[in-house]
Amino acid sequence: MTDAATAPTSIDLRAEYEGSGAKEVLEELDRELIGLKPVKDRIRETAALLLVERARQKLGLAHETPTLHMSFTGNPGTGKTTVALKMAGLLHRLGYVRKGHLVSVTRDDLVGQYIGHTAPKTKEVLKRAMGGVLFIDEAYYLYRPDNERDYGQEAIEILLQVMENNRDDLVVILAGYADRMENFFQSNPGFRSRIAHHIEFPDYSDEELFEIAGHMLDDQNYQMTPEAETALRAYIGLRRNQPHFANARSIRNALDRARLRQANRLFTASSGPLDARALSTMAEEDIRASRVFKGGLDSERRAAEALAR
C-alpha cells in the first residue's frame, strides 16, 4: 500500500485513462474491427477494472491484482487473434504486464512427440510469453482422453501451475469453438477455476462482412464496380451457408481469388496501356466466376436467357 502521508486524496480516472495510452488502443480496436460490440464492451470493462485498481493503489487502499486469464470462444475468422493482440497492448499500457507482446501457439508448439519432450517445449513457450499474453488457439486439442500415451496432459499441468503462480506477469487466453471449449473445461476443471473472463465472439452479419471486404480492398487500393458490389453481397449470402465458412477469413480468401481473376482478365484482354483505375477495379465477373455461384456468371446468364425464351 502507498504511504498514507504521500498518497493523493483523489484520482481523475479520465486523466488516468487518457494518460496511460489505453484510449489509443481502444480507439484502434474500434477503427480496425467491424462490429463485435459485445467483445469491445468486455475489453472496456477490463480497462476500467485495471484503471480503478491503479487508482485504489495510488490512494493507499487495499487492492488485489485481478486474474485476467481468459477464454475466447467463437467461429473462425471472428477476430479472436486480433483482439488478443490488442488486449496485450492494453494490458501493457495499464501496467498489468511488463512487455505487452503476444505469443500465439497451438498444440504442436507445446506438446512433444516422445517422453521428456513436452516439458521443455512448454516451458520454452512460457518463457517467451512471460511479461505478455500467451494465446493458445484450439486449446481443446491439448487434451486427448482417448489416447493414454498422449503427452498433452503434461503440458496442461505445467500451464496450470504457471497460470496460478505467475498470474501477475502472464495472461493466458484459450481460444476455440464454444462447444469444444465447454467440453474441455468440463474435463479440465483446473482451467475453469483459473479463467475468470469468458468472451464470446459472434459471427459477423452479411452487412458487416461486406463492410470488412470494403476495408480490405481499400487497404490494397482496389475498388468495385456497382455490379461487383451486388455480386459480392450475393456471394456473402451464399458462402455463409456452405461448408468451412470462416467469416472474415473467407472474405479475405474470396477477394484474393477475385484479384487473380481480375489480373487474368486484364492480361488476356489487354491490347494496350492500362491506367490505374483499370488496374484497380474489380468487375462483376471477377466475383461471380467463383464456384460458390455454381458455374459463375456465364451459367447465370444462360439460365436467364433460357427463362426468357
UniProtKB/Swiss-Prot annotation:
Effect after changing residue 80 to A: Abolishes ATPase and activase activities
ATP-binding among keywords: yes
GO molecular function: ATP binding; ATP hydrolysis activity
Effect listed in the UniProt record for changing residue 198 to F: Reduces ATPase and activase activities 10-fold
Pfam families: AAA (PF00004), AAA_lid_6 (PF17866)
Superkingdom, taxonomy of origin: Bacteria
Phenotypic consequence of residue 253 to D: Abolishes ATPase and activase activities
Family: Belongs to the CbxX/CfxQ family.
Function: ATPase involved in the activation of red-type RuBisCo (ribulose-1,5-bisphosphate carboxylase/oxygenase), which tends to form inactive complexes with its substrate ribulose 1,5-bisphosphate (RuBP). Catalyzes the release of RuBP from inhibited RuBisCo in an ATP-dependent manner. Activation of RuBisCO involves the ATP-dependent carboxylation of the epsilon-amino group of lysine leading to a carbamate structure.
Protein name: Protein CbbX
Annotated source species: Cereibacter sphaeroides
Gene of this entry: cbbX
